[in-house]
């Protein structure tokens, strides 16, 4: 996820103890024993020079598309790449939902709850593994990485159940990320991290945990040293052969119905959507390769979601421009995005389009509504008087579009956590509408199928109390030879059905085009 944190480098003396709760370039047994007395999750690290590796080559060597692995990257404002890329090379377990209750896949941490409400189990797991932040580590060194589906909101709000659950996705799945490689683009290094999680604290158990972590580091180091077959490939850009869930006429009927609801005072804005499906033999990694070139965004991700037997259930490939919420050191931040123009062909055209967007009263009114919604969401979990709006309604340029963006921040209340901030903001107002609950009720009346991943979030909660979640848009779910992409847009009183249909199709196009192009990759 957002990978811009500027962490200072540490001593390069192997085995030396840095000041406080910090780690040197390599974790010694003595360092580990000292940290194990105070921490439930202890990272064992090894920093290696890897200036000839790319995030993709490192991912291919360390993760190789195995179930339970991931790749997270970030391109700031769709242009320059951020400092860090993160590769999840191993996850012994995942917290998910089965039979409407929390369940662990794989080997759960000792003492972790199972059964009951999934959010309660998640909260208890984060509390069980809570660990003081350690200086000198990359922004993501351990935690739970995965997704919340849009339909997780049914555990937060009472909604009608009218849409068909045809994909049967779990409401959430979060990988226990124990083995991580953090690629530092500034230094040309990779920090390999093997976490020891929740042992009983005896000397024998601590030594075993250290030896096990070092063995995993050895495996990762050896894998990085292996040569790869060439990743050079030719490709073409065919038009995607996809199926839309609804025709323009059917979608226009939905828009007209919602406009009537808005005129009747039911809501100010509602965000309907529709799904696009595409048969494909493309590798999810190849889709990611194309997408990161054609549509670089602040949140780029590839996750391979395991099933109950340890096989691959589905993959998530996305390039999202928008965060739901981030929490860092007790400060929660959300970035409402509303108001869009396509990028111009020249700088002069971009400037003219920016002026047009800033002068559009309708776009500015919708943006203000979502900023107010963000303030209200954070106000539920932040200390009174700390919620504020910064950089109100400024332009941010991305690879293909520009948006009106604001920043809303607040200090978490003492009795609130990063998970509380996520649930307070969930789902995003930009994907539901305002007032949020009534808008979701109206969405349930008009959409045929449950949204699943679309409008949910992809990201992580770490064990030091931080979180970073992107809204799951510009995202494909790939399962058993079919890719599912969903898109929509905000409907207000003067919305036009054919325009909204075209707008949804345009938003889905970047991902559909990437899938079509990925299927043509071939060795030259």
From Swiss-Prot:
Cited SUPFAM superfamilies: ADC synthase
Annotated positions binding L-tryptophan: 74, 298-300
Cofactor dependency: Mg(2+)
Entry GO MF terms: anthranilate synthase activity; metal ion binding
Catalytic activity: chorismate + L-glutamine = anthranilate + pyruvate + L-glutamate + H(+)
Binding site for Mg(2+): 366, 503
UniProt keyword Magnesium present: yes
Signal peptide stretch: none
Biased composition annotated in UniProt, kind: Polar residues: 1-16
Region called Disordered, residue ranges: 1-25
GO terms (BP aspect): L-tryptophan biosynthetic process
Functional description taken from the UniProt entry: Part of a heterotetrameric complex that catalyzes the two-step biosynthesis of anthranilate, an intermediate in the biosynthesis of L-tryptophan. In the first step, the glutamine-binding beta subunit (TrpG) of anthranilate synthase (AS) provides the glutamine amidotransferase activity which generates ammonia as a substrate that, along with chorismate, is used in the second step, catalyzed by the large alpha subunit of AS (TrpE) to produce anthranilate. In the absence of TrpG, TrpE can synthesize anthranilate directly from chorismate and high concentrations of ammonia.
Protein name: Anthranilate synthase component 1
């Amino acid at each position: 996820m957002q990978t811009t944190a500027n962490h200072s480098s540490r001593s390069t003396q192997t085995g030396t103890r840095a000041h406080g709760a910090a780690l040197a370039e390599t974790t010694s047994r003595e360092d580990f024993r000292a940290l194990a007395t105070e921490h439930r999750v202890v990272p064992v690290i090894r920093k290696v020079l890897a200036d000839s590796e790319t995030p993709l080559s490192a991912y291919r060597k360390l993760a190789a598309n195995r179930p339970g692995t991931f790749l997270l990257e970030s391109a700031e404002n769709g242009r320059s790449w951020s400092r860090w890329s993160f590769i999840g090379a191993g996850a012994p377990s995942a917290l998910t939902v089965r039979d409407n209750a929390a369940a662990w896949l794989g080997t759960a941490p000792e003492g972790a709850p199972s059964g009951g409400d999934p959010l309660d189990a998640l909260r208890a797991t984060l509390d069980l593994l809570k660990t003081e932040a350690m200086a000198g580590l990359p922004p993501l060194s351990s935690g739970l990485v995965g997704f919340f589906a849009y339909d997780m909101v049914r555990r937060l709000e009472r909604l009608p159940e009218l849409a068909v659950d045809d994909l049967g996705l779990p409401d959430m799945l979060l990988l226990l990320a124990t083995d991580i490689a953090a690629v530092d683009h500034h230094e040309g290094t990779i920090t390999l991290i093997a976490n020891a999680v929740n042992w009983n604290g005896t000397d024998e158990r601590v030594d075993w945990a250290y030896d096990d972590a070092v063995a995993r580091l050895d495996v990762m180091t050896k894998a990085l040293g292996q040569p790869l077959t060439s990743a050079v490939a030719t490709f073409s850009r065919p038009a995607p052969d996809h199926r839309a869930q609804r025709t323009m006429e059917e979608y226009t009927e939905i828009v007209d119905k919602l406009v009537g609801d808005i005129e009747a005072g039911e809501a100010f804005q509602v965000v309907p959507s529709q799904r696009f499906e595409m048969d494909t033999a493309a590798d999810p990694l190849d889709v990611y390769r194309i997408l990161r070139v054609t549509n670089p965004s602040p949140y780029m991700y590839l996750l391979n979601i395991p099933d109950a037997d340890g096989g691959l259930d589905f993959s998530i490939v996305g390039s999202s421009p928008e965060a739901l919420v981030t929490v860092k050191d007790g400060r929660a931040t959300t970035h409402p995005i509303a108001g869009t123009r396509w990028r111009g062909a020249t700088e002069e055209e971009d400037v003219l389009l920016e002026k047009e967007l800033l002068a559009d009263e309708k776009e500015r009114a919708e943006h203000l509504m979502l900023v107010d919604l963000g303030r209200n969401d954070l106000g539920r979990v932040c200390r009174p008087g700390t919620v504020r709006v910064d950089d109100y309604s400024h332009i941010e340029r991305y690879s293909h579009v520009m948006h009106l963006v604001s920043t809303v921040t607040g200090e978490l209340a003492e009795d609130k956590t990063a998970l509380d901030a996520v649930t307070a903001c969930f789902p995003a107002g930009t994907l539901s509408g305002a007032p949020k609950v009534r808008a979701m009720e109206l969405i349930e009346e008009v959409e045929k199928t449950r949204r699943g991943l679309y409008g949910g979030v992809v990201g992580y909660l770490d064990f030091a109390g931080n979180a970073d979640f992107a809204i799951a848009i510009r995202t494909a779910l790939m399962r058993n030879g079919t890719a599912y992409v969903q898109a929509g847009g905000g409907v207000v009183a003067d919305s036009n059905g054919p325009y909204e249909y075209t707008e949804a199709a345009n938003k889905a196009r970047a991902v559909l085009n990437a899938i079509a192009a990925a299927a043509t990759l071939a060795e030259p």
